[in-house]
Amino acid sequence: MPNMAETKDPVRLRLLSLELLKQLWAGHEAMCRSVVRAASGSNLDCSSNNLEMPLSQETSSASSVAPSSQDKRHMLDPLDSRRDDTFDVAWYVKFNSRMDSFLPATGQHQEPQEELRPPSVPLLATQGLKGPVSLGGPKGLGPDKTQVPRSILSRLSKPSKPRVTSQESAVPESSWHSRPYLGYDWIAGSLDNSSPVTSEPEAFFSMLQRFRENNKEDCVCNSPEAVFPGLQESSGVEEDHECMYCYRINRRLFPEPVDPGAPCRLCGIPRDEKGPGTLVEPVQVRVSIPLSIMDPPHQYRIHRRKSFDASDTLALPRHCLLGWDILPPKSEKTSVPKSLDLWSSVSYGAGQRRDLSATSPPCQALPAQVTPPLWSEPQVAQLCPSH
């Protein structure tokens, strides 16, 4: 009989612990639903007295199981206590997994859950979210199995770090005049592009519009002939008018008409209908000289190691290159040939040898035969006379 009682008491204790865990789970679900309802209401105002709950509910809930566990402490087997601990830990892991799956749905209402807690929610259920929960038995049964679940509410409550972006703040146009100009902005700012008409108020433009509406016939014209009648009638031209035609200097320095068929700008008479000008009645022309005509067509490099002397030439390019091209005259007694012809150079050398043979003694004079080059015509051999 004692053995039967010892085996029934652990089973009864296990059943009581399961019932207690079911009650805790039901309270946790009720707490989560109440937190969601409290967060959805915007006009929830709880006093500071309701935020601090007494610990009487926690002690009363824990005392319901304590006497039975203390009475049967000496009857528990170490193996049974280990099996109970492993069962409690397995259930607690399942409990935490269900709790973590439910927390993301209520994570967006973190402030009401931490700060505003309705008075109907027990403190025992909320303690599992903020601190470690011990599901182990008394001190003599074995070590406490504690686990600290990582709550998503602590991560969401952290303030976000400021980020640096490349988008500049919009600067109003009224403050542009106070900013310094750089580069092309300075050039554009120095130009007078502002019109005095744009600075007029709106009343000025409204008055101008009313004036144009009242005097529509004078302000609006459909035919250009009525605006400039003098361009169509040549009779209105003054008697002292002189026609002017435009010419341009070409590369040969001759004037040529810019537009041969263009009439006079004032009277409209073409150039072909005008007679030749005389000394009494000259014809006025306008001649334009392109800048490219004034510049030389070639660029001459001036030698930097020679001197310049402009006394022997009048040409501008040769005048600039005198120190480079002109050399002092060479003497005629030099032995350098005047041409690059090979036959003339050979004949010139033979004449020099003939002069030398005339001054030398007769015994040393030998007949000299000059062989013409292969590419020249055959010539008769020249023999030096012997004395």
Curated annotation (Swiss-Prot):
Mark out the compositionally biased spans (Low complexity): 60-69
Q: Give the start-end ranges of region Disordered.
A: 50-80, 133-172
Which keywords describe this protein according to UniProt? Phosphoprotein
Biological process terms from the Gene Ontology for this record are: negative regulation of cell migration; negative regulation of G2/M transition of mitotic cell cycle
Listed Basic and acidic residues bias regions: 70-80
Q: Which residues carry this modification: Phosphoserine?
A: 307
Composition bias type Polar residues, residue spans: 50-59
Q: What does this protein do?
A: Inhibits glioma cells invasion and down-regulates adhesion- and motility-associated genes such as NFKB2 and ICAM1. Exhibits opposing effects to IGFBP2 on cell invasion.
Assembly and interactions?
Interacts with IGFBP2.
Query: Any idea what this protein is called?
Result: Migration and invasion-inhibitory protein
Species name? Mus musculus (Mouse)
